[in-house]
């Protein structure tokens, strides 16, 4: 039986997807060792948007990843890893030291949990190439040409002011070109404050078609008088169906461009 999706249509694999974000070197101690006890690390690569691109590619979807990495062995290895998983990397920018002073690839250390011990992540991503690149050099109209779907998250704009501008500009260009846009707020408290995240991510909402989650966004009861509160205030962490539905309806009333939450 064929199922029709109102966003994808009946042939989702005919869609061309592009995502944008930071890809990082992932270092993991083998055999569930703790980082402080490790004498060796297994190397791989990851990042929220890169993982989305990889997952889509593994499902047979035409998937492209856009990012900035240093033009050295680490950056080239990250690109090779993506390509080995059938992710297109044609738009990727490999930078020289005169373009991004630190010219480094972000890194994170993953301590894999075992039993009741939770996993642990340590990030070392400040001054990575993507946070220092001048994106005014990028022709976003040309970058998004030929794609049907753009996926972004709230992680990338939290990295640096230049990334914030990039994400908002990409959303505006994608909307103008008629791409379907999905956005995952994906709040990270180690990167910015709750209010900073809410302020920026709310700016993104007019350009989004598919919204993943209802935070971090402002949904003011009165746009001109914020003292009246947010429609989400007082909603429990485990809301009833009726409570969820009311919030969804409020979002759609405020942002009729939203096709799916």
Question: What is each of the regions a protein language model found here?
Answer:
Residues 1-35:
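Positively charged, low-complexity intrinsically disordered leader regions
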Residues 166-178, 200-207:
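Catalytic-core regions built around general acid/base machinery
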Residues 173-180, 255-259:
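A short helix->loop->beta-strand "cap" motif at the edges of active sites that frequently abuts
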Residues 51-62, 84:
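Alpha-helix C-terminal capping segments
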